[in-house]
Amino acid sequence: MKDAKELKLMTLEDVLSQIENGMTIGIGTGSTIELLIPQIAELIQQKNYTITGVCTSNKTAFLAKELAMNIVDVNDVEKIDLAIDGADEVDSALNLIKGGGGALFREKVIDEMADRFVVVVDESKLVNYLGETFALPVEVDKFNWYQVAKKIERTYDIHVSRRVNEDVPFITDNGNYILDCSLQNRIPAYELHEFLIHLTGVLETGYFLDIADQVIVGTQEGVKILNKET
């Protein structure tokens, strides 16, 4: 049986085939992207492509620059042709939960800018509903994070915890905290997103709703491609 890494590696050929010379691409954050970046760099070198990359995190930018990729700031581009990223959960409508790597705000900015957004996952990320297996990340200001957490818990049957990294609070590239919201039962994603995004102190939620154009899934039986219904 193939492990998660092997399943992700299976999908990368389908991703690379969508990269064309002259593109500006959005590059996500996380374990899947760490596998993909060296292959993008190799593609650029082998085919002598001119590719501009816009990264969703400082970590991704560092990895890409180490491989001599041309990386620019998001404010230096007018458009993004193709965004590529992983996801923590994917439902049947290709809605996502993202933010396990803590880069959800920048990921959403870049993914929404892109003409086409392609997601790469292994089959364990496919769920019946968002929040079924993975806590929803919410990026919040440090100033009132506790009040935001308690407001969420008072309103919904949700357990909220502030994310920590080696016993200290996790800090995003934007200087904020992440609240991980574990749903105790099914809550409609659009409803919960609207509630959360209007709380003072919330920058963004990890719900990526109606954004993905395609999800490439590595399964034990092979690669499965899911396309957004139009």
Swiss-Prot record:
Catalyzed reactions: aldehydo-D-ribose 5-phosphate = D-ribulose 5-phosphate
Pathway the protein acts in: Carbohydrate degradation; pentose phosphate pathway; D-ribose 5-phosphate from D-ribulose 5-phosphate (non-oxidative stage): step 1/1
SUPFAM superfamilies (UniProt xref): D-ribose-5-phosphate isomerase (RpiA), lid domain (SSF75445), NagB/RpiA/CoA transferase-like (SSF100950)
Keywords: Isomerase
Keyword Zinc: no
Regions crossing the membrane: none
Gene3D superfamilies on file: 3.30.70.260, 3.40.50.1360
A GO BP entry: D-ribose metabolic process
NCBIfam families associated with the record: PRK00702.1 (NF001924), PRK13978.1 (NF010585), rpiA (TIGR00021)
Function: Catalyzes the reversible conversion of ribose-5-phosphate to ribulose 5-phosphate.
Entry's family note: Belongs to the ribose 5-phosphate isomerase family.
Name of protein: Ribose-5-phosphate isomerase A
Originating species: Staphylococcus epidermidis (strain ATCC 35984 / DSM 28319 / BCRC 17069 / CCUG 31568 / BM 3577 / RP62A)
Name of encoding gene: rpiA
